[in-house]
């Protein structure tokens, strides 16, 4: 932590990239994917009717084309039933980096858009895995409002259906087919245009990478650090170390695991914690707050929270506006 604070205080780095994953939003009440007790995949694995299927099938484009019910079923289970989630300390720390003029970009694997609620400008954010709104029909290509889809799947939301085979799906209002999908990136799809346009030049320009709340197991985002210049340091703020470089025996073992892994995992090491890279372990939010304090940004942090208290979540506002049209 001291290394990161010193780097920021000394003004050494002006083009910081933050790469974030589901772990940064757990404190906002949004489940991550792989935590043993609260992760979304753990919850899916516990459901007997999935019959040993990998939880990732819910977010696979081939599965969606074959049967969109699994996705809209889990979508209904995750959709907020009361208050919308609010930004975490991490999200405010991200905005503070931008306000101090040292954030080049945030590359997030999340689709919750809490960065916007915390005041991060749109041009500083790359949603690697897309966004929830709008939706599009895969059959006719027409744009469909998210509020239309939410209205259509109310039984999934209200009745807490425990079997995806009983889930309802939105039919396209233009062609009446059932392949209406939010603009999120499924496994097997290309990443968004903004990602493809910016990632190579951004990482070539980056002088410090901060990685937060991610297992670094989903391609191609997990390989982004490989685009950095060799001397660029990385700071991993996570509960545990991931993708750590090791000795030759460990590297060989990781490569073997990668070759025979089922799905999308890449186990090969990226972070060199024995040399240029650093690891900050423990609770992510506690660590972000401590970094803010050590930087002397506490007053700015409190003021930023006050300024954003009245900002509605973009999706909440969108649904409300569309419902009133």
Predicted regions and their residues:
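Conserved catalytic core of sirtuin-type NAD+-dependent deacylases
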Residues: 1-325
């Amino acid at each position: 932590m001291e290394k990161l604070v010193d780097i920021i205080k000394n003004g050494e780095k002006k083009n910081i990239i933050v790469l974030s994953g589901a772990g940064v939003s757990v404190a906002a009440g949004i489940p991550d994917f792989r935590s043993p007790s609260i992760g979304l995949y753990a919850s899916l694995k516990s459901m007997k009717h999935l019959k040993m299927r990998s939880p990732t099938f819910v977010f696979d484009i081939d599965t969606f084309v074959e049967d969109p019910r699994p996705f809209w079923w889990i979508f209904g289970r995750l959709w907020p039933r009361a208050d919308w989630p609010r930004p975490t300390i991490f999200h405010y720390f991200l905005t503070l980096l931008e306000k101090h003029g040292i954030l080049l970009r945030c590359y997030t694997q999340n689709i919750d858009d809490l960065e916007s609620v915390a005041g991060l400008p749109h041009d500083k954010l790359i949603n690697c895995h897309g966004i929830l709104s709008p939706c599009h029909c895969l059959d006719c290509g027409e744009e469909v409002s998210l509020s239309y889809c939410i209205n259509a799947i109310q039984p999934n939301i209200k009745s807490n259906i425990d079997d995806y085979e009983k889930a309802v799906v939105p039919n396209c209002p233009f062609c009446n087919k059932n392949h209406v999908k939010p603009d999120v990136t499924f496994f097997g799809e290309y990443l968004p245009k903004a990602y493809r346009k910016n990632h190579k030049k951004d990482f070539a320009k980056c002088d410090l990478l901060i990685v937060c709340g991610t297992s670094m197991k989903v391609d191609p985002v997990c390989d982004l650090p490989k685009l950095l210049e060799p001397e660029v340091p990385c700071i991993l703020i996570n509960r545990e170390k991931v993708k750590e470089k090791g000795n030759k025996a460990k590297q060989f073992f990781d490569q073997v695991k990668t070759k025979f892994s089922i799905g999308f995992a890449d186990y090969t090491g990226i972070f060199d914690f024995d040399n240029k890279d650093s690891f900050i372990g423990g609770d992510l939010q506690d660590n972000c707050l401590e970094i803010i304090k050590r930087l002397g940004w506490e007053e700015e942090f409190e003021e930023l929270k006050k300024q954003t208290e009245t900002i509605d979540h973009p999706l909440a506002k969108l649904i409300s506006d569309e419902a009133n049209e």
